[in-house]
Amino acid sequence: MEKLQYELQGYLEIDRYRKQRFLYPLLFREYIYALAHDHGLNSSIFYEPTENLGYDNDNKSSSLIVKRLITRLHQQNHLIISVNDSRFVGPNRSFYSQTISEGFAGIMEIPFSMRLVPSLERIAKYQNLRSIHSIFPFLEDKLSHLYYVSDILIPHPIHLEILLQTLRTRIRDAPSLHLLRCFLHEHHNWNSLITPKKSTSIFSKENQRLFLFLYNSHVYECESVLVFLRKQSSHLRSISSLAFLERTHFYGKIKHLVVAPRNDSQRTLPLWFFKEPLMHYVRYQGKSIMASRCTNLLMKKWKYYLVNFWQCHFHLWSQPGGIHINELSNHSFYFLGYLSGVRLMPWVIRSQMLENSFMIDTAIKRFDTIVPIFPLIGSLVKAKFCNVSGYPISKSVWADSSDSDIIARFGWICRNLSHYHSGSSKKHSLCRIKYILRLSCARTLARKHKSTVRVICKRLGSKLLEEFLTEEQEIVSFIFRGTRLRSERIWYLDIIRINGLVPHS
């Protein structure tokens, strides 16, 4: 793989690429398809890893098919091979389509990777930023001091031509963009690429990498104006004394303070400014969150600006209710499988002054994250682990597998859900999900052996329970003793994608 990357780097450094920025000749290079197949060039930075569908298990056979594909590309008058071509009809037709699309995706990623990877390498421990859980510590630190939150659903493009037009600002190679357009037009269902929920689309599985690249490029352009305005906008709050500053995590926030000099007539006290950005913004896939300390009127102006910007520049029509504005104090928003919000926690502080003591009632804001039980049960119903009432049922399609395989599958799902939802402040709903999965596993084994759940549990004993325990539970139990384990939030920095059972849209 290092040899392939070295060869690719050598091609990119030649004068012809520097002057003309041609990318399409890479379609005739065999190592491009090897990199696309192996997800090289750190491609996981741009999107989540996907399954390699349609490839032969035999690498030699796959390599031979790629060589035949390149040979036929040389023999064509144009690079795009029609789906009606009789020479490409057969068991390899799906592979050819997928290979070309992944080759296109890998080539189009080159300009982005050359700019992004060096900038990330300058950031210490930038790998941690890839974790989905890295968003929540940011929200935990910021949202407790903000007033309004806006849920934004980024609209899908109405036509693929809009996606291709957005690439022109990032990729200067016009022939490559023209070839990409021709390739997409060769497929009858090419417009269905913009709706990934359609399983009948030819892009739904085979060409998922190309779809993700185009969609992420579209989202990047839609939010680019937000990032620009976010950097340009900030407001300063004048505070006459340091005592008015919030004492929570004071030493961590002291770096955000600046002292503004006064004129000669105002030398009594310095002016303290709290350098706070006007807007905080986070996003995952097509769902984004904006939060601010500004007024409701200003939030509505942001909403009006976004809707008009998308309509004028991208011809995107925001869905009714695509942008919701709510107060953080009395509203919770659903994001990345968590129901998040800010709630007031009552505190009683005892103050001692000489011989007198006082009890002071106060309240502090805390960022709260819980796991909603009904969306998770809905996902389990779709996966046929339980019915609509949450009653566990057997997984009949797994009944033909071995006992160890059945237990391992259920245990793997349970551990992944526990690992992802470790940041919940209330673990009661997660315990119910674990109970459903354990009982569904027992019912599946009972169905296989034509027995009862009680007999299966008695025969397997602790083996059935140990498979559902996570290593994190054993380690964390040494850190948080007693009941604190149920209320402590733990964020992991190794989660780069959401479990399939977690509803996040």
From Swiss-Prot:
The keyword Ribosomal protein does not apply. It holds the Pfam family Intron_maturas2. Belongs to the intron maturase 2 family. MatK subfamily. Usually encoded in the trnK tRNA gene intron. Probably assists in splicing its own and other chloroplast group II introns. One of its GO terms (biological process) is RNA splicing. InterPro entries: Domain_X (IPR024937), Maturase_MatK (IPR002866), Maturase_MatK_N (IPR024942). It is found in: Plastid, Chloroplast. It comes from Nuphar advena. This is Maturase K. The lineage of its organism: Eukaryota, Viridiplantae, Streptophyta, Embryophyta, Tracheophyta.
